[in-house]
Amino acid sequence: MPILVIVRHGQSEWNLKNLFTGWSDVELTPTGEHEAEYAGIVLRPYHFDIAFTSVLKRAIHTLSIILNQTGATIPIIENEALNERNYGDLQGLNKAEVGEKYGAQQLIAWRRSYTEVPPGGESLENTCQRVIPYYQEKIEPELKDGRNVLIVAHGNSLRALMMHLEKISPEDIAHVDLATGAPRLYEFSSKLDLNSVSYIKLPETPLDVSTLL
């Protein structure tokens, strides 16, 4: 039976600084690289046939580290449909400072609402409108053919996909988050009915990755 694993990229430089990132193309921090290494370690027991990611380097780098850890050599498809939600004019701004300027309620609406559009950017609804068709047209056929798929992308593009796969409502998605570097496993039937959803647990204690290479 086919499986799908989704992974949010490791911590980025702007995650660390609490900045709105969106389509800004920033790199991973050393912590983010370690998160990707841990994800790769726990994914070693799983076989993947193909991987999908965005065109942003924090996701591409995370995927590269994961595949290096698993030892897999598989096709990789990069597409901007899997990019992070575009935060428009908020990109590069500190979230706390935005809250001070516009108020906490507006900050929460821009970050968590399904329909709220930041100036010059996308709502989560807009993000769904590109992520879900791409999944249906390009990724779902791979699963239907029995292939195991790995997707490494971003918090909001993956939340959009979670809404579709797990039938999460626009109201409930506001309370759903996805930690950096935490693999989420979807197991399907041969007819692509969803059988189970679970996180593949990362190590409870820090690992010396060098001993596992």
Curated annotation (Swiss-Prot):
Residue ranges crossing the lipid bilayer per the database entry: none
Positions that bind substrate: 8-15, 21-22, 58, 84-87, 95, 111-112, 155-156
Active site residues according to the UniProt entry: 9 (tele-phosphohistidine intermediate), 84 (proton donor/acceptor)
Enzyme class per UniProt: isomerase
GO molecular function, one term: phosphoglycerate mutase activity
Reactions this protein catalyses: (2R)-2-phosphoglycerate = (2R)-3-phosphoglycerate
Taxonomy, superkingdom: Bacteria
Pathway: Carbohydrate degradation; glycolysis; pyruvate from D-glyceraldehyde 3-phosphate: step 3/5
UniProt keyword list: Gluconeogenesis, Glycolysis, Isomerase
Biological processes annotated in GO: gluconeogenesis; glycolytic process
EC number: 5.4.2.11
Site (Transition state stabilizer): 154
Alphabetized PANTHER family for the sequence: PHOSPHOGLYCERATE MUTASE (PTHR11931)
NCBIfam families referenced in this protein's UniProt entry, alphabetically: pgm_1 (TIGR01258)
Family affiliation: Belongs to the phosphoglycerate mutase family. BPG-dependent PGAM subfamily.
Role noted for this protein: Catalyzes the interconversion of 2-phosphoglycerate and 3-phosphoglycerate.
Name of the protein: 2,3-bisphosphoglycerate-dependent phosphoglycerate mutase
